UniProtKB/Swiss-Prot annotation:
Gene Ontology molecular function: any one: carbohydrate binding
Gene Ontology cellular-component terms listed: extracellular region
Organism: Lepidobatrachus laevis
CDD domains membership: PTX (cd00152)
Disulfide bond annotation, renumbered to this chain: 51-112
Protein name: Jeltraxin
Length: 225
């Protein structure tokens, strides 16, 4: 598999983990005013992969990644929403799909979600484990104009946050691709041997705006699984 990962890196971009420290965003308090807005390029997505790393003591539901489109009923175009200790909801075009997952433990969690609008195939990976695949009802693409928020759940385009859905903890390595990332590269993301840069949004090179009292910690290191 190592050879496949190196081949992927040559064409799609990545760097060896450990060469530089990680940028971590710390969400220190329960509030409806602290969040991060990601600013990817605007284009239509027929496929998507979202990968992120999170670390929290929360034992209640919370929003990690919220992608909304403009218009009625499009606030949960893609939502990653854990229900600790052992459930998570992935929403696609406001269809909530629930997964039973391994119980939460107090460690960094790696989460990847992939979706293909042509087939409706939805895949959830957590800490290297692929959970039973699902098929969504929607076959509509995502975009082109989207709002992407970390740490809050959008009930309208770009806002209408609920304090009871807020994330408290740390987040890092949020990357988005405009295709379904192959399993060998998802496993590489979990292994931390390589950091794969998203071609739609890259944590290391993407634009973002911090709102509220979020603390940016640079040159940090995240323990391996």
């Amino acid at each position: 598999m190592k050879g496949l990962v190196i081949f992927f890196c040559l064409f799609y971009g990545c760097h060896v983990a450990g060469a530089t420290g990680k940028t971590i965003m710390l969400f220190p308090q329960k509030t409806d005013t602290d969040y991060v807005t990601l600013k990817p390029t605007e284009r239509v997505l027929n496929q998507i992969t979202v990968c992120l790393k999170s670390y929290t003591e929360l034992i209640k539901e919370h929003s990690l990644f919220s992608l909304a489109m403009q218009g009625s009923g499009k606030d949960n175009t893609l939502l990653i929403y854990p229900y600790p200790p052992n459930n998570i909801s992935i929403s696609i075009h406001n269809e909530d799909i629930y997964f039973k997952v391994d119980p939460e433990v107090l460690q960094w969690k790696r989460t990847c979600v992939t979706w293909d609008s042509k087939t409706g195939l939805l895949q959830l990976w957590i800490n290297g484990k692929l959970y039973p695949r699902r098929i969504t009802k929607s076959r509509s693409p995502i975009g082109p104009q989207i709002s992407v928020i970390l740490g809050q759940e959008q009930d309208s385009y770009g806002g209408s946050f609920d304090i009871n859905q807020a994330f408290v903890g740390e987040m890092s390595d949020v990357n988005v691709w405009d295709y379904v990332l192959p399993p060998e590269n998802i496993k590489a993301y979990f292994s931390d041997d390589y950091t794969l840069d998203g071609n739609f949004y890259s944590w290391d090179g993407g634009n973002y705006t911090i709102n509220g009292l979020i603390v940016v910690l640079r040159n940090q290191f995240i323990p391996k699984l």
